[in-house]
Design a protein with these regions (language model features):
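Conserved ABC ATPase signature
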Residues: 11-15
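Conserved ABC ATPase "signature" region
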Residues: 1-7, 34, 55-58
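Helical segment within the ABC ATPase nucleotide-binding domain
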Residues: 51-63
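H-loop/switch region of ABC-family ATPase nucleotide-binding domains
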Residues: 72-73
């Protein structure tokens, strides 16, 4: 399912970041978790392995009914996986909707590409 048998005999310290994330998904499957939280799946992972991870997430959702809560900055990756999308900043929901809706939301753009939410709030209070 996850095509990780080729790394079965390798020490954990010798496999790549993406391979470690695939092993983590495999461990999730072993305990049959129905809700899975993934933090920064794409961090340090090459695009090929990220696509493999994304394919596995989609299959686990469709075939086994797993629900995923994914924390990720790569909106292209998220677009493959999630609908709806919720964007948070400073511990609060900033926007929610389709990937296109949140990518074009002025608050999201300002928080992540502009001066940042904290600075904007400080300026408004002054």
């Amino acid at each position: 399912f996850l095509t990780i048998s080729h790394i079965a005999d390798q020490k954990a310290g010798m496999i790549s970041g993406g391979q470690k994330k695939l092993v983590e998904l495999g461990r999730t499957m072993m305990v049959d978790a129905k809700i899975v939280f993934l933090d920064e799946v794409g961090a340090g992972v090459n695009r090929t392995l990220l696509n493999t991870i994304g394919d596995a997430i989609v299959r686990l959702n469709k075939e086994r009914g797993y629900t995923f809560c994914v924390i990720e900055h790569d909106m292209d990756f998220i677009a493959r996986l999630c609908d709806p999308v919720i964007v948070m900043a400073e511990g609060k929901v900033l926007a929610q909707g389709t990937v296109d809706e949140v990518k074009n939301d002025e608050r999201v753009i300002e928080a992540y590409l502009g001066r940042g939410l904290k600075n904007k709030l400080k300026e408004g209070a002054a």
